[in-house]
A protein has these predicted regions:
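Signature of alpha-helical transmembrane segments and their immediate interfacial
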Residues: 337-339, 405-455, 489, 495, ...
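Helix-loop junctions and hydrophobic alpha-helical segments within the transmembrane domains
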Residues: 220, 227, 231, 305, ...
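Membrane-proximal extracytoplasmic
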Residues: 1-242, 252, 321, 366, ...
Length: 948
């Protein structure tokens, strides 16, 4: 990038200096802080601290310390004023003495330099030759000689005032209704946001000790808080899920030591997982740990332990005594061998179905790859433990008498299941027909669920985009922003409100002075008057409060969501309608019609058209005829006006390691006065030296013999209106209409919006519409999933065929997948959750889970038939014999997801669709396994009723 930038510099207009921004992503703003002073605090000279003083402390005390924090690539500053030394000439004195602003700037720059002149050697020593010429204070600047008139030196202080002054700033910061200085810590791309934010907060506390008494620096926004809340949610889900799994194991196994062995797989598998994550550089966060289910992790161990307990009981009954140690070892090996193949294949299938998730790319790939890696690591660890630790632990620790009969709970379940199984086998056709109807019905229902990319994460805080009419001054915007903050901070749920207005020092996020980003930081819910108040209700109250303040338009979103939307589509809203064409007026007219139509679509909020016009301008138009008469060119007029209004840097003043620009410009009162600008003296030196000035022109204006000419003789000054901004995309002009979506799924909203605009808005020839926003990622991911999901199903069937060596049996077990998916669809519909990528990942995971129980049952039925049992009896005994492992694996797998499905903590929104799909799917899959799968097996093998 730097190399390409150097190549195009020659094509960029003079005065523009392109620079690379921070090496960071759009989500790199992880930590913000404010510098403020107690109104009673005083400096050493007894004066109060000003905004310039606070900015100086930020630039030269705080910022250098924070930039040394590992992982920080930039500390961006907004607010206050950079200190400058202002030389403000009096135009009347300049005209009287024949000087221009450029003359003053050139004289100061020429008298403010240090020069090195090599070195000399004397007496064996080397002396560097140094010629100091820099000014040390304001007095020395004032004493710089501009020229001599009749032997009398003319100093800078003779024509100008020299004093400290503020910069012409392009941005400001406010907090709780008053101005502050704000710093933003930008994280280096690839760094860990939590680590960097914590290190920045610690360094900020150290920086506080180096500040004067009465000046405080406080954190305003720390992403660590959100990260910690989401990690706490994940940790709580995992702990609660583990406890539920362990309770179920105790209840259904009826053996304390067996349950402990199974439960021991959880920490061992987690150790395996965390080791792999550490080696792979994957951090523990909401996405990486969000799909971990301890129920799935112990499924393989459950199958092995349950079969060992059953075999131990049968062997004890046959022997009439407890088994010896050697007999127990032999029985463990035999029982494990009996089920190790289906259990390993089951875990292998669950693991394999996560592999196609790696085919996701873009934003969805970044989000879900860590999740897939973590689950694959956990299940791989579980398979290793099922092969090694579990059989060894059973053989060693399950000594003594093992209960031969089922516990009361399982006996009660068996009594209820036997008549249901008998009914299912008698009414096999009806059961299969009912399953088919359910699959078709849920397929139709899925098309009505709506869709979104991923559920919005409730960050806890609110970001508000406040916009005024183009041309609103920074001073006016600050006043309006103070009123907004004073109104918002009165809410008892609000902790503080701070804003960034306009563009900061490093223009990584440029905004005009009429626009502000407002961050509304909320108190913890426990401190709210009503902790159960819905977020949507509070958002409506905030919106109603600020709508009462005139002159503003608002967009409400969240801090991270705002940046994510910008990264995805270039706008901060959920949906962007981009209109492309040539003429700005036509674009604006059609854009307003689109906005009017979009506002009528249910779910639309904060609909607005990008402001492209209405920027007030003071235009100085050079008169080329007059310029030619004086032998001047437009560049000299442009240079004079630029120096007078914008200022010209004429060197720097050094105070220790601090340096401040010396700027030549008009006094503030004259800068604001067009009449004073018209009287600016423009130098005629170049024309006089060239000798090509038109004497008649000079005589007509009374400037014969003069060294300068007033600007009014060379140009006209007039107020006008120009475009506020001209945006292009792929080389074509475009205007954007944005909208947020409230209380509706994103996919359904965009679909209706497209239909409504296509029906009600006539787009002129040569103009066209494109749609942008986070739904683009939904479309991209959906297209990828349309390939990934069939591939997943093919992998499942291939593994089943490998396990059984029979297409029939593989098809029987595979039939569990569609019925499991129906349960997921019904669960989403019951909870009002739209389809999303999170739900899609849940369906992928469910495809693997759905075949596990069928694999175990069909394997047992096949072994019974191989043992000589007739088909009907083998099917019945196989279903009853595998009732406990089927229920156990289903219960532990689903209960492990229950905390994710019903938790309301930070980040639970992302986990909820995935968990809901898996729980609903496991319920329907279990019903299939216990009632429909025996029917399918008997029906497909009816022509081969003899033992296999």
């Amino acid at each position: 990038m730097a190399e390409r930038l150097q190549q195009v510099k020659s094509q960029i207009p003079t005065g523009l200096d392109p620079q690379l921004g921070p090496i960071a992503t759009g989500l790199g703003e992880i930590f913000m802080y404010t510098i403020d002073a107690d109104p009673k605090a005083r400096k050493a000279d007894g004066t109060p601290y000003t905004a310039t003083d606070l900015r100086t402390l930020q630039d030269w005390v705080i910022r250098p310390q924070l930039r040394n924090v590992p992982g920080v690539t930039e500390v961006n500053t907004i607010g206050g004023f950079q200190r400058q030394v202002h030389i403000t000439p009096d135009p009347a004195r300049l005209r009287a003495l024949g000087f221009t602003l450029e003359d003053v700037a050139e004289a100061v720059e020429a008298n403010n330099q240090n020069v090195g002149a090599g070195y000399i050697e004397r007496n064996g020593q080397q002396f560097l030759v140094r010629i100091p010429g820099q000014v040390a204070n304001l007095e020395e600047i004032g004493n710089i000689v501009l020229a001599r008139r009749e032997g009398v030196p003319i100093h800078v202080h003779d024509v100008a005032e020299v004093k400290d002054g503020p910069e012409l700033r392009s941005g400001a910061a406010t907090q709780n209704g008053h101005e502050v200085v704000m710093g933003t810590v930008v994280m280096l791309i690839g760094a860990n946001s939590r680590d960097v934010a914590q290190a920045a907060a610690a360094r900020l506390q150290q920086a506080q000790r180096s500040l004067p008494e009465g000046v405080t620096v406080t954190a305003s926004y720390d992403r660590t808080a959100l990260v910690d809340r989401t990690i706490a949610t994940v940790a709580r889900n995992l702990v609660e899920g583990a406890l539920l799994v362990i309770v179920v194991l105790f209840l259904l196994l009826g053996n304390f030591r067996a349950a402990l062995i199974t439960a021991a797989v959880i920490p061992l598998a987690m150790l395996f997982t965390l080791t792999g994550m550490a080696r792979g550089g994957i951090s523990a966060n909401l996405m990486s740990l969000g799909a971990l289910d301890f129920g799935l992790i112990v499924d393989g161990a459950v199958i092995i332990i349950e079969n060992c307990l059953r075999r131990f009981g049968e062997r004890q009954h046959a022997l009439g005594r407890d088994m010896t140690r050697q007999e127990r070892f032999q029985e463990t090996a035999s029982a494990t061998a009996e089920v190790i193949r289906p259990s390993l294949f089951g875990l292998g299938i669950i693991t394999a179905v996560y592999l196609p998730i790696f085919a996701l790319s873009g934003v969805e790939g970044k989000m879900f790859h860590p999740m897939a890696i973590t689950v694959v690591l956990a299940l791989t660890g579980a398979m290793v433990l099922a092969l090694t630790f579990v059989p060894a632990a059973i053989a060693l620790f399950l000594g003594g008498r093992v209960q031969e009969k089922e516990n009361r709970l399982m006996a009660w379940v068996r009594r209820r299941y036997e008549p249901l199984l008998a009914f299912s086998l008698r009414r096999g056709r009806w059961m299969v027909a009912g399953a088919l109807v359910l699959v078709v019905g849920c397929g139709l229902l899925a098309t009505r669920l709506g869709s979104e990319f991923v559920p919005n994460l409730d960050e806890g805080d609110v970001a508000m985009h406040a916009m005024r009419i183009p041309g609103t001054s920074l001073t006016q915007s600050i006043d309006m922003q103070k009123h907004i903050e004073n109104r918002l901070v009165q809410f008892p749920e609000v902790s503080k409100v701070f804003s960034k207005i306009g563009t900061p020092e490093v223009a990584s996020d440029p905004m005009p002075p009429s626009v502000a980003d407002t961050f509304i930081m909320m108190k913890p819910r426990k401190d709210w008057p009503d902790p159960r108040k819905p977020r949507a209700t509070l958002l409506g109250e905030l919106e109603a409060a600020v709508e009462q303040l005139p002159g503003n338009n608002y967009e409400f979103t969240q801090p991270i969501q705002m940046r994510t939307n910008e990264l995805i589509s270039g706008v901060r809203a959920d949906v962007a309608v981009m209109l492309f064409g040539d003429d700005l007026e036509t674009l604006l007219a059609v854009g307003r019609r689109i906005a009017a139509v979009a506002g009528k679509v249910p779910g639309a909020a904060d609909v607005r058209v990008e402001e492209t016009s209405g920027l007030p301008l003071l235009t100085v138009t050079p008169d080329r005829t007059a310029l030619a008469g004086y032998g001047l060119n437009p560049g000299q007029v442009q240079s004079t006006v630029a120096t007078a209004v914008g200022g010209q840097v004429a060197g720097q003043l050094f105070e220790g390691d601090r340096r401040f620009d010396i700027v030549v410009r008009l006094p503030e009162a004259l800068r604001q006065d067009p009449a004073a600008l018209a009287d600016l003296p423009v130098s005629l030196e170049s024309a006089l030296s060239g000798g090509d000035a038109d004497e008649s022109s000079r005589a007509a204006s009374g400037t014969n013999g003069a060294r300068t000419v007033p600007l009014r003789e060379l140009a006209t000054l007039a107020n006008s209106e120009g475009p506020n901004q001209i945006n292009r995309e792929n080389g074509k002009r475009r205007i954007v209409i944005t909208a947020n979506v409230r209380d509706r799924d994103l996919g359904g909203f965009v679909g209706e919006l497209q239909q409504t605009i296509g029906r009600e808005v006539q787009v002129p020839n040569g103009y066209w519409i494109e749609y942008g926003g986070s739904f683009e990622q939904l479309i991209s991911a959906s297209r990828r999933l349309a390939i990934v999901v069939p591939l997943t199903l093919v992998i499942i069937f291939a593994l089943l065929f490998w396990a059984f060596g029979s297409i029939k049996d593989a098809a029987i077990v595979f039939s569990g997948v569609p019925l499991a998916l129906t349960g997921g669809v019904l669960a989403l519909a019951a909870r009002g959750i739209p389809l999303s990528i999170s739900a899609g990942v849940g369906f992928i995971a469910l495809s693997g889970v759905a075949v596990l129980n069928g694999l175990v049952m069909i394997s047992f039925v096949r072994s019974l038939r191989e043992g000589g049992l007739p088909l009907a009896q083998a099917v019945r005994d196989g279903a009853l014999g595998r009732l406990r492992p089927v229920l156990m694996t289903a219960l532990v797998a689903s209960l492990g997801f229950v905390p994710m499905a019903f938790n309301v903590g930070a980040g639970s929104e992302v986990q909820r669709p995935l968990a809901t799909v898996v729980i609903g799917g496991i319920v329907s899959s279990t019903l299939l396994t216990l009632l429909v799968l025996p029917v399918l097996y008997r029906w497909l093998h009816r022509r081969d009723a003899s033992p296999a």
